[in-house]
Amino acid sequence: MSNYLFTSESVSEGHPDKVADQISDAILDAILQQDPHARVACETMCSTGLIVLSGEITTDATIDYNAIPRGIVREIGYTSSEIGFDASTCAVLTAFNKQSPDIAQGVNRSKDEEMDQGAGDQGLMFGYACDETPQLMPLPIYYAHRLVEQQAKLRKSGRLSWLRPDAKSQVSVRYEDGFPKNIETIVISTQHSPDVPRDELVEGVIEEVIKPVLPAEMLSNHIQYLINPTGRFVVGGPMGDCGLTGRKIIVDTYGGTAHHGGGAFSGKDPSKVDRSAAYAARYVAKNIVAAGLARKCEVQVAYAIGVAKPVSLMVQTFGTGKIPDGKLAELIARHFDLRPRAIIHELDLLRPIYGKTAAYGHFGREEPSFTWEKTDMAEQLKADAGI
């Protein structure tokens, strides 16, 4: 299929599921700041007037489980019951256990054995890259993120004073011969104050949110803008929908362009391969594309709990590879150590860097702390491939 429409969506930092993700990663960062080798699996639920924290945490760190969620909610912009959630008055409940000793015995290693640290669970993870954008990301998800990011900037700056924190975007792109041709449909649903006229809202979103973000040459002559299609979006955030950590895994990754192994990222320390191996797989795939070895590359890696070495590695280039996929897999095995501790070491993952990942995508962003986005292996791969 070379001619088709493909759609991806994103959500803003004020979407209830993203509120939960950001709280979980803020807890993780606060713990890693004091205890880099902590074991953290922090789950968050947020609903009307309530935040619940649960999961498994083993650490010597002392953190304020009450203040951190309130700080995140306040930073997002939920500061009044008038908009559905108030950082100062919401209740915060906690219910944490320690990591199971049955899991810990497969993950914990002495200093001499640390490179053989086992995976924290079984599972399969995917990484993907393509040449549709300079960031080597699929175009639909890349621009879906930028739209809700722009909505948040305009809201926080006060330029569009009627914007409120909760928002969603959706971008439909027409592909011809496998390449993105133009953007056919944009959907933006944004929470707003009750008194803004609809005409003002629609014009503001199109002119201030959409047009400054999307490249003019990509807009179809008959592009369709669907702005708040229900006509009203006043009740939003945790008051409108219950938010849960890990419920936006496609938004977090490639917008549906690539496969997903099912494991969420936020609230998990890097001993959990759901997170660290997915980051490593992106690192591998991005370097393959950056090296010019393929236009599209998807990497699957799989693990058994307590075992360091991956049980499988697969590469697909969807007919765009300069060398056979099997040869690429051999190339990856020579140049990348995908044992969990090696990933943590190579990508420097024991730092409190995860808060920034929790909204607007874990991939395709030019943040210095996003080490999985570097392309430092591209030249070595190209040389070894002999092209």
Curated annotation (Swiss-Prot):
Instruction: Indicate the enzyme's highest-level EC class.
Output: transferase
Q: Where are the transmembrane segments?
A: none
Query: Where along the chain is Mg(2+) bound?
Result: D17
Q: Where is this region: Flexible loop?
A: 99-109
Question: Where is K(+) annotated to bind?
Answer: E43
Pfam families associated with the record: S-AdoMet_synt_C, S-AdoMet_synt_M, S-AdoMet_synt_N
Q: Which residues bind L-methionine?
A: E56, Q99, D241, K272
Reactions catalysed, semicolon-separated, are:
L-methionine + ATP + H2O = S-adenosyl-L-methionine + phosphate + diphosphate
Question: How is its cofactor bound, per UniProt?
Answer: Binds 2 divalent ions per subunit.
Q: Does the keyword Acetylation feature in the UniProt annotation?
A: no
Q: In which pathway does it act?
A: Amino-acid biosynthesis; S-adenosyl-L-methionine biosynthesis; S-adenosyl-L-methionine from L-methionine: step 1/1
> What is the required cofactor set for this protein?
Mg(2+); K(+)
Which keywords describe this protein according to UniProt? Answer: ATP-binding, Cytoplasm, Magnesium, Metal-binding, Nucleotide-binding, One-carbon metabolism, Potassium, Transferase
Cellular location(s): Cytoplasm
Q: Residues that bind ATP, according to the entry? A: H15, D166, A167, K168, R232, F233, D241, R247, K248, A264, K268
Please name the GO terms that the record assigns under molecular function.
ATP binding; magnesium ion binding; methionine adenosyltransferase activity
Q: What is its EC number?
A: 2.5.1.6
| One annotated Gene Ontology cellular component of this protein | cytoplasm
Q: Which GO terms describe its biological process?
A: one-carbon metabolic process; S-adenosylmethionine biosynthetic process
What PANTHER family does the annotation carry?
Answer: S-ADENOSYLMETHIONINE SYNTHETASE
What is said about its interaction partners and assembly?
A: Homotetramer; dimer of dimers.
Protein role? Catalyzes the formation of S-adenosylmethionine (AdoMet) from methionine and ATP. The overall synthetic reaction is composed of two sequential steps, AdoMet formation and the subsequent tripolyphosphate hydrolysis which occurs prior to release of AdoMet from the enzyme.
Q: Which family does it belong to?
A: Belongs to the AdoMet synthase family.
User: What name has this protein been given in UniProt?
Assistant: S-adenosylmethionine synthase
Question: What is the source species?
Answer: Nitrosomonas europaea (strain ATCC 19718 / CIP 103999 / KCTC 2705 / NBRC 14298)
